[in-house]
């Protein structure tokens, strides 16, 4: 039962796990924020925003597009494998809406985390514990729940969600450590 729950959790999240890794490999190009900063805006209590970049150089259109495409393609490939695996473990097929939501949601979560990092004065690559490990999970799940509600409810049962929120930080730290060891990242987180 536990092994099947873990297998379903990993299978269902693979289209969300892969995009940020592919974005690192395919990155470069024009930053999403175009190099812009938030000018100082104030309200009656003082400074609301700072002059840091909106997102930073690490969030590019190319990385976002390639990452999203990779997640969707992976979901379509998993759909081809699913009939062979489903007899052993009850893994789901991915409707296209779920595939896109998982992949793009992962990218969007990472983009939102970058925005939060800049607002809290963290530089590109700086650690942001908790947010770094779960940003993409929360947004990809939320977006999937909105655009593929029936599939989401059938797939992401409470035990599967628990497995995702326990396993993801471990997988995230492990894969980032490997990417750092191979020189693909400047930081091990």
Curated annotation (Swiss-Prot):
Pathway: Membrane lipid metabolism; glycerophospholipid metabolism. It comes from the Archaea. It is found in: Cell membrane. The keyword Cell membrane applies. GO terms for molecular function: CDP-2,3-bis-(O-geranylgeranyl)-sn-glycerol synthase activity. Keywords: Cell membrane, Lipid biosynthesis, Lipid metabolism, Magnesium, Membrane, Phospholipid biosynthesis, Phospholipid metabolism, Transferase, Transmembrane, Transmembrane helix. It is an enzyme of class 2 (transferase). This is CDP-archaeol synthase.
